[in-house]
A protein has these predicted regions:
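Non-heme di-metal
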Residues: 1-179
Length: 179
C-alpha cells in the first residue's frame, strides 16, 4: 500500500500538526502557571507537553520514513526557513498591509528576517559539517565543554574532555559576545 496521497497520510499530517501545536501551547501555559506561582500545574503542563512531543515524533517518523541524517535534516531545515522568509512571511506581510494591519505586517516582515538568518545558519553549519570543520578550525580558537565548562585552546577540540571525560561532541567554539 502507498501512504502518499492516502486519507491516512492526511490524518497523519493533521495528527502531527495538532500534537506539535499542543506541545508548544502547553509550554506557554506552563510558563504562565509558573509565573503565577503554580509550580505543580506548570510541571503538569510541561510533562504533557513532552508527551505531545513524543506523539508528534511518532507521526513525523511515519510521514518521513524515520528521521534522516544530520546533513539531510540541515538541508530540509534550510529549505523550510527559505520558504518562510521568501514566500510565506513576505506574502503574509503584504496581505496584512492590504487589510490595514500594519503592526502585524511589521511583525511578519521582522520574523521573516529572522527566518533568513536561520536559513543562513543552517547552511553555514552544513558547510562546516561537509568540510570537516565542526570540531577543527584553521586557526587557534577557544573550545568550551558544554558539560563541565572546561576551556581548551587549539585548532581541534579534544576527542575527550580532560576534566569530565565527555566526548568531543560536547565541545563548541566559545562565544564571547558578553565582553
Amino acid at each position: 500500500m502507498e501512504l502518499k496521497g492516502s486519507k491516512t497520510e492526511k490524518n497523519l499530517l493533521v495528527a502531527f500538526a495538532g500534537e506539535a501545536q499542543a506541545r508548544t501551547k502547553y509550554t506557554y501555559y506552563a510558563s504562565k502557571a509558573k509565573k503565577e506561582g503554580y509550580n505543580q500545574i506548570a510541571d503538569i503542563f510541561e510533562e504533557t507537553a513532552n508527551n505531545e512531543k513524543e506523539h508528534a515524533k511518532i507521526w513525523f517518523k511515519l510521514l518521513h520514513d524515520g528521521i534522516q541524517s544530520t546533513p539531510e535534516n540541515l538541508k530540509d531545515a534550510a529549505a523550510g526557513e527559505n520558504y518562510e522568509w521568501t514566500d510565506m512571511y513576505f506574502n503574509f506581510a503584504k496581505e496584512a498591509k492590504e487589510e490595514g494591519f500594519d503592526k502585524i505586517a511589521y511583525l511578519f516582515e521582522e520574523v521573516g528576517k529572522i527566518e533568513k538568518e536561520h536559513e543562513e545558519r543552517y547552511l553555514k553549519v552544513l558547510e562546516n559539517l561537509e568540510n570537516g570543520t565542526i570540531f577543527e578550525k584553521n586557526g587557534e580558537v577557544y573550545w568550551h565543554c558544554q558539560n563541565c565548562g572546561h576551556i581548551h585552546k587549539g585548532k581541534v577540540a579534544p576527542k575527550v574532555c580532560p576534566v569530565c571525560d565527555h566526548p568531543q561532541s560536547y565541545f563548541q567554539v566559545r562565544a564571547e559576545n558578553y565582553k
